[in-house]
Amino acid sequence: MNSRQMYETIKERLNAHPHWTFHFDAKHDTMRIEDHRTKKGVTISLPGVIAKWHEQKDEAVREIIYYVEETLKTMEETATLSGNERNIYPVIRSTSFPTETKEGVPLLHDDHTAETRIYYALDLGKTYRLIDEQMMEKEKWNRERVKEIARFNVRSLPTPVKEDRVADNVFYFVNTNDGYDASRILNDAFLAEMHTRMEGTMAIAVPHQDVLILADLRNDIGYDVLAQMTMSFFANGRVPITALSFLYENGKLEPIFILGKKRRT
């Protein structure tokens, strides 16, 4: 199954929606589904769907179909910030992610690291909507109000961790699948608490939106394992973020490149 074939498979399943248009981007291996009435839509990274298809077959296709249908259905509805304060969260995206909507409306965002940005989303249950300036102006909200509420809400999310050990290195995973696992990288208190558990160097990875990896690296093997693990998660994620990891030092995140047995370049 290649990207063109997956595009055709998804398109065939969604053809029952007469108002939707489809576009295949061979250069970026993506598919765009858009409602021509609203000019709003979603862009899918096809390699991630294909990787899941190799493991789950038709279940992977059904999952992406459900995601697209729910997302575009929600876009037809009017979403408001007022009254939904508890449903506003920050989301992490790569620096290649657009900073404005297809209509040219700026999305509310902040710099995070050299590899990542922070966007802000209104959770709508089965999907979410990224908050843009037009939405804020309409309700007379300012940027700081959105950010303050979002940061508070992400700190309120539970942070259950699963632990795995490889060659004396310890890896912790946050994987609740609530859509905001990667967002927990913004919970400074949680990161500081995890840092107290570390015996070696603390590293963090957010390969896609549904996982946060925290690593206690005690030898060179740990660096290699983290690099391979992060790349695998990145390739399989529905919303990929970055295949790079970060060192956590003095409350700061610094991207690291791991090549073979070398720790950083």
UniProtKB/Swiss-Prot annotation:
Family (UniProt): Belongs to the UPF0354 family.
Full protein name: UPF0354 protein GTNG_2723
